[in-house]
């Protein structure tokens, strides 16, 4: 493949990432060359650049490698919402006496999260199957990774996103009050599986794709309800857990700067959902008979992020990676690992 064609492909790929990001929530992409990291250092490996092995022996070609990794993912803000919530826009009372006819007019609305952050700390085991051939389109160069650890999350959203205006008729429009709900969890168990594949390489650059799925269940720390009509703060509690699910797919390009630093650019797209326990507001409903709540799912669907990061090879069997992502999430991911 000519150098002009290679440069053209790189430019086209980077342009595609920039254009797509304006129209498209997602997890960290990671380095596209992860399946062959860190065994690509020229001086320490005494091999051609990014050529892991020149042997054509079948056993050598199929031999894999194991990585023990650590990682932390920190989301500072995120775009998500509760969709299609029926909200009362007007209340009409007809008739007189103790039981007048009350008619409510409703309209569906979407409520955005006002604030949201998430911290994840995990250890991981990754098994990679490198491709020993010199082919530009490798058959292998694939890795499978499993992560386990702890996840803690916080979010704040308008109270009406969790209000239930349809179970009982309202006496007046004044009962449709504005306010805020805050939910904070403790650290709960999280697991994550990912698959990464190098789909093209030329000895200097890599193009890779990946898919990730993350699931967490976090015990509730506190739930705060604050209505503007009543400035008193009410704390609800629950023995349930805050469920969190996320999936993501990504595509990325990396080109090494020198023998020890490998920067990359990637684009990721995915979906996130959060679900608070159904009994989150039971105590508030028992105390205030005119307040009814319905816990609804918070989602962020098919939104994308631009991911920019770099991998540093400290030694022939150790590496670390720092990545930032912008878009529907503003987040930083830090990871590293040892190869065995």
Curated annotation (Swiss-Prot):
Classify the source by domain of life. Bacteria
* Keyword set includes Signal: yes
Q: Which UniProt keywords apply?
A: Cell outer membrane, Ion transport, Membrane, Porin, Signal, Transmembrane, Transmembrane beta strand, Transport
Keyword Ion transport (UniProt): yes
- Its chief place of residence is membrane
Q: Name one GO biological process term.
A: monoatomic ion transport
Task: Please list the GO terms describing molecular function.
Answer: porin activity; structural molecule activity
Q: How does it sit in the membrane?
A: Multi-pass membrane protein
**Record protein name field:** Outer membrane protein B
Q: Which organism is it from?
A: Chlamydia trachomatis serovar D (strain ATCC VR-885 / DSM 19411 / UW-3/Cx)
What does the record give as the organism's lineage? Answer: Bacteria, Pseudomonadati, Chlamydiota, Chlamydiia, Chlamydiales
Which gene name does the record give? ompB
